[in-house]
Amino acid sequence: MQIQDQQKVIDWKDHEFDGLYDEEYRRHSLIHWTPIEVTKKVLEWLNVTRGTHVLDIGSGIGKFCSFGAIYTDGQFTGVENRLDLIEVANSINKKLNIKNAEYVHSNITEIDFRNYDAFYYYNPFCEYLSISDSIDDSISYSPEKHREYEDSVIEKFQDLPINTKVVTYCSEKFAFPDTYELKDLLFKDKLALWIKTK
């Protein structure tokens, strides 16, 4: 079934949007998928307009990118290392007739951040540290892998131009380079806006 009226989707609550997904994915919403209210604030902070290209680091089933693509005229790319989650995300694109969101099946270490204007980071490597809250059993406990991926992202953030914006969610322990300044906090300090200043 394809939903033609995207304007209606903009007004949906989380339970309505989550209803697009099968139960096996829907049950992870509270922990792993970005709430719509949070997504709207992220898009505002990143000032997403036509021509803005946003990278979602660890996009999962694509809820952030899909809603963002409907809510704004920006271009969204989600990178995800699990092919089955990308297939789910693409199925939602088809249902909602979304043309400005895409998903890349890749390891984050292989992504060139310089191809993007703004970034969203929702604790994408947490499953390497907390298996009990995992989406599936494809990821094994590995603090070393968690550190490797975070270090790769930090290094890539360092190479971006001044005024680059990054929004993090539930990522309070992420060690931003000192070239970035914290500019704002919301949602009990779980949502943070960082801007590269030097």
Placement of each model-derived feature along the sequence:
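S-adenosyl-L-methionine
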Residues: 1-49
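Conserved SAM-binding loop of SAM-dependent methyltransferases across substrates and taxa
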Residues: 63-73
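C-terminal substrate-binding/active-site "lid" region of AdoMet-derived donor-dependent transferases
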Residues: 128-196
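Conserved SAM-binding strand-loop segment of SAM-dependent methyltransferases
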Residues: 97-106
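Conserved SAM-binding motif I beta-strand of class I
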Residues: 75-80
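Conserved SAM-binding loop
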Residues: 89-90
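Short conserved loop adjoining the S-adenosyl-L-methionine
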Residues: 110-114
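Conserved class I S-adenosyl-L-methionine
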Residues: 51-60
